[in-house]
Design a protein with these regions (language model features):
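Acidic, polar low-complexity linker/tail segments
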Residues: 1-31, 39-45, 62-63, 77
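C-terminal helix of von Willebrand factor
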Residues: 110, 168-195
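VWA/integrin I-like adhesion module and closely mimicked acidic/polar interface patches used
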Residues: 136-181
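Residues that scaffold, gate, or flank divalent-cation-dependent active/transport sites
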Residues: 35, 135
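Short beta-strand-loop
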Residues: 66-96, 141-144, 167
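…and closely analogous acidic/polar surface helices at protein-protein or active-site interfaces
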Residues: 27-28, 38-69, 85
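Von Willebrand factor
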Residues: 77, 88-128, 137, 155-164
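Structural motif
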Residues: 29-31, 127-131
Length: 195
């Protein structure tokens, strides 16, 4: 409207144009790293994680954030969704994701790091978040990807005896930590660094 007010009844030219600074499309990338190993099948943790992904993707859709998804399990890692806009139909392509086998966390992180590094080259001003959804059942202790501005470890470990590996990863990486239960209860802002 301000451009039209400046123009009034005159012919439109460059001096009449008014610009409004806005945050660029996809100013934030949320890259999700989903543990699809056999241990996540126990207690329907993988199903809970996929439901949580749908909710987080829906939130990204409302916020016009960019999303990516890397799945790891069974000795391999796969980029299931390259960075792009979130859509309202996320459940359709998340539901068929299966699980089983070992927990190649380092391989998954390597794939996520590649996605984040490529995004950093194409959009250097974009803020890059890495969300690691895992039960932490791995003996690997990989380094955190340097290309992530923020890392959130969402811990799906359950049971009376817990190894605490998800929390240990968050501490090692200086990452934010939240349990799956706390995130499910709407505590998406209650995660905290390391503890």
């Amino acid at each position: 409207m301000s451009t039209l007010r400046a123009k009034r009844s005159m012919r439109l030219d460059a001096r009449h144009l008014r610009y409004r600074r806005t945050q660029g499309e996809g100013a934030v990338l949320h890259c999700f790293l989903l543990d699809c190993s056999g241990s996540m099948l126990a207690g329907e943790r993988l199903a809970r994680a996929k439901g949580m992904l749908v909710a987080l993707f829906d939130r990204a859709y409302r916020e016009r954030a960019t999303i990516a998804l890397v799945c790891f399990g069974g000795g391999r890692a796969e980029v299931r969704r390259q960075p792009g806009a979130a859509h309202w139909f996320n459940e359709r392509w998340i539901a068929p994701i299966g699980g089983g086998g070992g927990t190649p966390l380092a391989l998954g992180l390597s794939s996520a790091a590649t996605v984040l590094e490529r995004a950093a080259r194409h959009r250097p001003a974009q803020r890059r978040w890495l969300w690691v959804l895992t039960d932490g059942r791995t003996n690997e202790k990989p380094q955190a990807p340097a290309s992530a501005d923020e890392i959130v470890v969402v811990d799906f470990e359950e049971g009376s005896i817990r190894a605490g590996r998800g929390k240990a990863l968050a501490l090692d990486w200086g990452a934010r930590y939240i349990t799956a239960d706390a995130l499910s209860e709407g505590g998406d802002h209650s995660y905290h660094r390391g503890v």
